[in-house]
Curated annotation (Swiss-Prot):
SUPFAM superfamilies: Actin-like ATPase domain (SSF53067). This is Actin-related protein 4. Residues 107-116 have a biased composition (Polar residues). Its main location: nucleus. It is found in: Nucleus. Chromatin interaction component of the NuA4 histone acetyltransferase complex which is involved in transcriptional activation of selected genes principally by acetylation of nucleosomal histone H4 and H2A. The NuA4 complex is also involved in DNA repair. Is required for NuA4 complex integrity. Component of the SWR1 complex which mediates the ATP-dependent exchange of histone H2A for the H2A variant HZT1 leading to transcriptional regulation of selected genes by chromatin remodeling. Component of the INO80 complex which remodels chromatin by shifting nucleosomes and is involved in DNA repair. Belongs to the actin family. ARP4 subfamily. It holds the Pfam family Actin. It comes from Gibberella zeae (strain ATCC MYA-4620 / CBS 123657 / FGSC 9075 / NRRL 31084 / PH-1). GO terms for biological process: chromatin organization; DNA repair.
Amino acid sequence: MAQQPLSSSAQPTDIYGGDEVSALVLDPGYCSTRAGFAGEDVPKSILPSFYGHVTGDNSRDLFGDECLIPRENYEVRNYMNKDSVVEDWDVAARIWENMLVNRLQPERQTPPSKNGLNDDPRPEGQDGEGDVAMDDAEAESMEKPLGENPLLVTEAPWNTPKAREKAIEIIMENWGCPAFWMSRTPVLAAFAAGKATSLVIDVGGANTSVTAIHDGMVLKRSIQKSPVGGIWLSSQIRSLFETSEPQVELTPTFMIENKTPVDALSSPSVRLRNFPYSITDSFRAYEEERVLTEFKESVVEVWRGPGRYSVPGNEEFVKTQPGRVFEMPDGYNQMWREQRFRVTEGMWDENAGYPIPEADRLNKTQTIPELIRAALNAVDVDLRGNLLANVVVTGSTSLINGFNDRLNTELMAMYPGLKIKIHAAGLTSERRFGAWIGGSILASLGTFHQMWISRKEYEENGPNVVEKRCK
């Protein structure tokens, strides 16, 4: 049973007194990490979760825009795995601290005892009017980077107890936060949409998850996840380029020295840069992913229906419709018509996508309709109608044109007798940052103050308190 919050009269007033709390919200993901102040509309600080590592004698790590500059002996890595669970805690702590402290906090003032303004030249033992004494506890609190900021951190619904305990340990021990909370991303996305009960479909960069939320709690048996996300779509686009006639060369922007405009389908007229060192595969793949992301955002579309895209006649119909032109970094450009629909079709029909390596291929249970079916089959029959009337769509990959229309078509075909209502934020930022916005709302509520895990509670119970409190 979850621990009951203290009554408001018993709350420590230094943390819980009043509605004004300078709380921070941190939302780590596989593709990017978001951070900002509770109560604001969007995160103030957004950094890639990828970082650069220079090997050799001058070994070091590089974050943010520094990752985009090619270097010798330079690898691009990620501190998370594709399940959105932290793997490299040393790097994670450094990235998070950089975002929460260096980017969000004002420069800290030097303590009066150390700024030299109160030094008194008189001999020891004589009182000096300007002397300022500071006890050890006060000095320590001044040195902790987040000593005045409660912190709410989001997590994937399948996050491990070990990872949760490691997070609170870093935040309390290293940063000195006065209070902490950890909340699952589907719950926060539902809060951002104003729903306490909902079916949350989160289509992110590394994976897609479907989770049933009832009265603000995750129904754990309903949690379903699949690798069908933005990275998987990128593998479909690579396959499209490789099987096109003519074959499309994927040359990342950093390799282009100059280019000349050419007609559609003509070979590119480009001069490539020469580097005095070899470019690593990981850096090239990272730069190629940026081009593929641009292609996804501007060209790729989801077939809305009726029926599946593979139904005879649908592809012929699409060929008669206006296409979209995309220019590659090297200047090659082409009109894309039916191909841009087939790229996303594998999300809904495992047999309809482009051929990709066996390791990345989806089976039927990993498609979005089957994830939804499995999630709903795992919950009580009486809840299903309420969940389908409150479907919340979030995640940046859900912004692909036509996604919500196709989702509605699939749900109506699967559950013809039930009312289907999809809630998807219209603003791009609200869809991309749904979990962060939910955390921002939650951490800024006066009624939530009594829920924080205080520093005193952490010191009494240890890191395991996060498992007991954050259900």
